[in-house]
Amino acid sequence: MLRIVLAVIAGYLAMAVLVFATFTGAYLAMGTEGAFRPGSFDVSTLWIVVSVILSFIAALAGGWVCTLVGRRRAAAVALAAVVVVLGLAVAAMEFTHSGEQVPAARSGEISNFDAMQMAQQPTWLTLLNPFLGAAGVLLGARFRKAE
């Protein structure tokens, strides 16, 4: 049981580190104007596509790491459940606090930190992310098993 708990933690940390690193790199590569729609904090279509791809890759890696540490598929299933539960909890918080502290208009360049805080993504993406993440985790676990 302890191995599964440690595997879930390791897999989740791998996902978090990859998401932070790749999203930071993507934002720096795209710049403010590439990541957001003109004059707003609504994310651009390009950002949506890139973020879905990067999130799925991070989930694959998380599932792979989780299975490496846990040595059983049960660890990846537990991580997938954690991803869905936490993802839906974050979505619920976003819906209850939607747009409270985000200025309506954006002008000029903004820092990576401010971009993370103020980005407004579509509702459908907020709801899709937990399930896409869980699918990536389970598929990543299968990659580990195939080796």
Q: What residues fall within each predicted segment?
A:
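Juxtamembrane/disordered regions of integral membrane proteins
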Residues: 1-147
